[in-house]
Regions:
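Short, flexible, mixed-charge glycine/proline-rich loop motifs
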Residues: 72, 90-102, 114-120
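Catalytic-core loop-and-flanking beta/alpha module that positions acidic residues
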Residues: 50, 72, 79, 98, ...
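Short cysteine-rich clusters marking metal-coordination/redox-active sites
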Residues: 104-107, 126
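Short intrinsically disordered terminal tails
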Residues: 1, 132-139
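Residue-level signal for secondary-structure boundary elements
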Residues: 54-58, 62, 101-105, 134
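Short functional micro-motifs and their immediate structural scaffolds
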Residues: 109-115, 131-134
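Cysteine-rich micro-motifs
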Residues: 120-132
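Long, charged N-terminal interaction/targeting segments
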Residues: 1-90
Length: 139
């Protein structure tokens, strides 16, 4: 993800990205959000949902701070590893990971023209972005 978009997430959700400045020996978040810009909106919505949920819970009882351990792409899908997430947070993350399979990682388009690249590194791309990257593509 571009530094500009990544920094928007860091600024808006500092608690989720609290380990971003830790060394590699302590956290994989030192690599940042290792995904394409097309998933920014999905990540932003996920972060806001988690923040809202944690705020609601925190009013009822003190809970450990939820934080991201790693945000990356793996086998064409968003992968997020979370610490201190309850069942609801884990379900939110699972939903976002599933949705990423229908959103172009490069441009963010959603829907019918989004598929997987073929050959080499598998990515979720729309037909147009796959063509620009000279990648094979299948629905």
């Amino acid at each position: 993800m571009s530094p500009k978009l990544q920094n928007k997430l860091y600024k808006k959700y500092p608690d989720l990205f609290i380990d971003r400045k830790e060394p590699v020996t302590k956290s994989c978040m030192c690599w940042g959000c290792d995904v394409g810009d097309g998933w920014f909106t999905l990540l932003n919505i996920l972060c806001q949902s988690i923040a809202d949920h944690v705020e609601t819970l925190d009013k009822k009882k003190k809970i450990p701070s939820v934080k991201f351990l790693q945000v990356k792409e793996k086998f064409s899908l968003l992968r997020i590893y979370v610490e201190n997430g309850d069942e609801i947070v884990n379900n939110m993350v699972n939903f976002a990971e599933t949705m990423s399979g229908h959103i172009c990682e490069t441009c963010g388009v959603f829907g019918v023209n989004v598929g997987k690249t073929t050959g080499g590194w598998i990515k979720t791309l729309c037909k147009d972005c796959a063509k620009k990257e000279n990648k094979g593509w299948k629905k």
